[in-house]
Amino acid sequence: FNTYYRDNDLYEVVAFTAAQIPDIAGRKYPAELAGKLYPKGIPIYAESDLTGLIREHQVDDCVFSYSDVSYTRVMNLSAIVHSAGANFILLGPRDTMVKSVKPLISVCATRTGCGKSQTSRKVIELLMAKGLKVVAIRHPMPYGDLVRQKVQRFATLEDLAFHECTIEEMEEYEPHVVRWNVIYAGVDNEAILRAVRRHPLALL
């Protein structure tokens, strides 16, 4: 949404759906993040409401944007969308990736629990051993105030308290902080990349 639809007046985004992470459905993607085309924000519904939303709003396109899912899961959702009468869209990298001006290594996986965090920390360890300064960027855990979570920077243990991190977030960020490795998170990757440009470093 942020990279392709937020400022694109050719489209009207009527809703997001949520799955896996609890307590997101029933909230709104706030106006402060949604941009000038959405002064009231954008409502977030449970994925189980998908078929009804398509019919209620006469939706033309449903854009799949979840992470950590299998091919089977994606195709099952495409069948649900098509049976409700909408197009099922997968945007490509040119429309979704944000250009980095720093050297960048990405660590990805098909599902939660594959070991992305451990792999990332090992890669950082190897790069730091070569004398490189590395900053980590992690996708957010959107449990709290999304506006406050636009750009989060963690460099000290005090930052964990300042950002009111959950136990899950602390488990993720603390291993970076205790070895003096800065980690960023947040819901706006473009804003995060602008924030880290001043660092003479590589990104993970």
Question: Predicted regions: what is each one?
Answer:
Residues 1-7:
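Glycine-rich adenosine-cofactor-binding loop
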Residues 96-144:
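Walker A (P-loop) phosphate-binding motif
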Residues 2, 19, 64-68:
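Structural motif
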Residues 29-94:
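Phosphate-bearing ligand-interacting subdomains
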Residues 19-41, 145-150:
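N-terminal beta-loop-helix "entrance" segment that forms/cooperates
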Residues 12-23, 137-138:
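Short internal beta-strands
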Residues 126-204:
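ATP-dependent carboxylate-amine ligase catalytic core
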